[in-house]
Regions:
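The substrate-binding groove and active-site-proximal loops of carbohydrate-active enzymes
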Residues: 57-68, 82-90, 115-131, 155-166, ...
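Secreted/periplasmic carbohydrate-active enzymes, especially glycoside hydrolases
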Residues: 1-109, 136-146, 151-152, 169-171, ...
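A short acidic, amphipathic alpha-helical/loop segment
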Residues: 97-101, 216-223
Length: 236
């Protein structure tokens, strides 16, 4: 089994042949594990695991934001030294090297796709969402779904739509797309609008991701119809 303390991996070789001629070949690492989200918490291989994580941006300080495998590895080593067992890739998909390392080093990952949907936060960067969101979901799922470290997909982070009932359908559309491409994983989103847990937005998610206000968790857990609540951000 793939576990946090013993992240055992297998290698699968896929070969495409045309007659006797090999025309393509690919090696894929994968791990065997089960993931469950219950009202009592998160379970890996049937055992309850408390997620102790960070929101990990893709920059590497003075090394820059380009993928640097040893830089990522050192980051994860430091995180593990002070007890981290999970990472949320804020606020965009990680470099493939990050997931390879998390597979190898036993780190759980919430794989986040968007920071902006249809509504812009800064007046820019939202022009292509309607045209590209489906393809982006498909590409992310197809790229990352074989990684045992990935335990959930995150469709967004603090999007303005969480407070607009007439736009909640966008969240439902994204959740449905993730389920279509990968029915084995839950979908979450980082929410910073306190009312989003009650106004119906949370019902479009499998796991409600709460940003800050930890004092309100118990009250919201009693008030809403869904059972999965997770702290996405609690401090900066």
């Amino acid at each position: 089994l793939w576990t946090l303390n013993a992240p055992h991996l297998y290698k699968m070789k896929t070969t495409v042949r045309m007659g006797d001629k090999v025309i393509d070949q690919k090696f894929t690492n994968f791990g065997v594990r089960t993931v469950e989200w219950k009202p009592t918490g998160f379970y890996l291989n049937g055992e309850r695991v408390q997620l102790k994580g960070v929101c990990q941006h893709h920059d590497l300080g003075p090394l820059g934001s380009a993928a640097h495998t040893r830089g990522y590895e050192r980051q994860i080593e430091i995180l593990k030294e002070f007890g981290v067992n999970s990472i949320r890739t804020s606020h965009n998909p990680p470099a493939p090297e990050v997931l390879d390392l998390c597979d190898k080093m036993g780190i759980l990952v919430i794989d986040e796709l968007f920071d902006i949907w249809q509504c812009s936060k800064e007046g820019v960067n939202n022009e292509s969402f309607n045209e590209w969101h489906e393809r982006d979901v498909v590409n992310l799922c197809h790229r990352d779904r074989n990684h045992p470290c990935v335990i959930a997909w995150s469709s967004g982070n603090e999007v303005p739509e969480q407070g607009m009932k007439n736009l909640h359908h966008i969240s439902q559309t994204l959740t449905d797309l993730f389920h279509r491409e990968d029915p084995t994983r839950k979908v979450t989103s980082g929410c910073n609008n306190a009312n989003a847990a009650r106004n119906g937005f949370g019902d479009t998610l499998d796991v409600y991701g709460y940003n800050y206000k930890p004092w309100a968790y118990k009250d919201f857990a009693k008030a809403v119809s869904y059972t999965h609540l997770r702290a996405h951000e609690t401090s900066q």
